[in-house]
Amino acid sequence: MSNIGKVVQVIGPVVDIKFDEENLPDIYNAISIESGNAKIITEVAQHLGDDIVRTISMESTDGLMRGMDALDIGAPISVPVGKPVLGRLFNMLGQPIDENGEVEADEYSPIHRPAPSFEDQSVKPEMFETGIKVIDLIAPYQKGGKIGLFGGAGVGKTVIIQELINNIAKEHGGLSVFTGVGERTREGNDLYYEMQESGVINKTALVFGQMNEPPGARMRVALTGLTMAEHFRDEGQDVLLFIDNIFRFTQAGSEVSALLGRIPSAVGYQPTLATEMGSLQERITSTKHGSITSVQAVYVPADDLTDPAPATTFTHLDATTVLSRSISEIGIYPAVDPLASTSRILDPRVVGEEHYKVASDVKHILERYSELQDIIAILGVDELSEEDRLVVIRARRIQRFLSQPFSVAEQFTGYEGKYVPIKETIRGFKEILEGKYDDLPETAFLFKGSIDEVIESAKNMVKS
């Protein structure tokens, strides 16, 4: 029998509904309210007493009035999952917004579900090969790990995201879910068309809750994307989950918390900040079936890393990839800062002794080169000691060899994209560190894949 209540109060995105005493809907249940031709979905957030439940709307509440009928759906919001979602664009409710017709999905999953049990989780740390040299060498990603992607506007966050989607699709046969949380509509639009042009759209599901949507939708859209990713993982796939931007998830939660009348905590954030973040992040993990590796763009308010929002996010991250404007300004892409980026699995017990030693030596040389920059600027390279001059020669070659042509940027750069296996990456940097290529011109190292391409390019330069 259907359970119908009446709307008794509407305050912005908050809708209070009265039900019969014995039929109160559960917390997180979806409620459907018909307003004219539209159907508005809200989610139960609180039981207030007097048989009234307080719900948060996932859509605009324009047109809602007291006395309207509200139907308890009897379960949380459910979204389509499985193969039919690939290549499609969804809103937070799992409704397609790409004007390509209905999604013919056989399965739907609730967006609220517990994290995998300890017995199901995979505990063996394993490296996830991205084919991007600077990431694989300096700050490797863990399979089933969580990675923070830090960077300002225009330094290449989106290009790295697209290349990762491209590489996991082509090299690993894996799938991706991109979740835009509180993003600018224009950026989501650009990403959708760029993905269509680069051909990676068919291995990707996109979910957007844009900036102009109510806080309920922006708070829950990350769960919609995660639910789609979890289904692929449980089918034995390795999935990439992109969340852009994880700060907007916290921000939307703060708005919802204030609307529900909770007393704010530090810096005005919700008192449940750590719980909300934990309930999302704990579901992003590897199981014995497959893995979800999550790359999350992190906005840092006023560049204050101690702000509760980024500080709470950091506790969950396994690796950080920091994009630097100063590196992009000298024309080296991807503009990843090798000295600021970190990874928990850059450990000889996980990546092996050789990888660890090469990565440490590369960092050491780049750090020394960074220290020498002021001396070089004032006195020039000729005034340096023989040892420091060698550091400069190798550091400049390493810096350029950390650049790489991307498949998704071929139309802009004119270079064919390269996927570099980790063994090739380690071999290349090891040989540069040993001084084998001190006599090759620096420009031969720029935008190359493996070290063999560098040698070939240098030979061609000599011939011409």
Curated annotation (Swiss-Prot):
Belongs to the ATPase alpha/beta chains family. Coiled coil: none annotated. ATP binds at residues 151-158. Pfam families: ATP-synt_ab, ATP-synt_ab_N, ATP-synt_VA_C. It is an enzyme of class 7 (translocase). It catalyses: ATP + H2O + 4 H(+)(in) = ADP + phosphate + 5 H(+)(out). GO terms for cellular component: plasma membrane; proton-transporting ATP synthase complex. It comes from the Bacteria. PROSITE patterns: ATPASE_ALPHA_BETA. InterPro entries: AAA+_ATPase (IPR003593), ATP-synt_VA_C (IPR055190), ATP_synth_F1_bsu (IPR005722), ATPase_a/bsu_AS (IPR020003), ATPase_alpha/beta_chains (IPR050053), ATPase_F1/V1/A1_a/bsu_N (IPR004100), ATPase_F1/V1/A1_a/bsu_N_sf (IPR036121), ATPase_F1/V1/A1_a/bsu_nucl-bd (IPR000194). It is a peripheral membrane protein. Its EC number is 7.1.2.2. This is ATP synthase subunit beta. Produces ATP from ADP in the presence of a proton gradient across the membrane. The catalytic sites are hosted primarily by the beta subunits. PANTHER family: ATP SYNTHASE (PTHR15184), ATP SYNTHASE SUBUNIT BETA, MITOCHONDRIAL (PTHR15184:SF71). It is found in: Cell membrane. It comes from Clostridium kluyveri (strain ATCC 8527 / DSM 555 / NBRC 12016 / NCIMB 10680 / K1). One of its GO terms (molecular function) is proton-transporting ATP synthase activity, rotational mechanism. Keywords: ATP synthesis, ATP-binding, Cell membrane, CF(1), Hydrogen ion transport, Ion transport, Membrane, Nucleotide-binding, Translocase, Transport. The keyword Cell membrane applies. F-type ATPases have 2 components, CF(1) - the catalytic core - and CF(0) - the membrane proton channel. CF(1) has five subunits: alpha(3), beta(3), gamma(1), delta(1), epsilon(1). CF(0) has three main subunits: a(1), b(2) and c(9-12). The alpha and beta chains form an alternating ring which encloses part of the gamma chain. CF(1) is attached to CF(0) by a central stalk formed by the gamma and epsilon chains, while a peripheral stalk is formed by the delta and b chains.
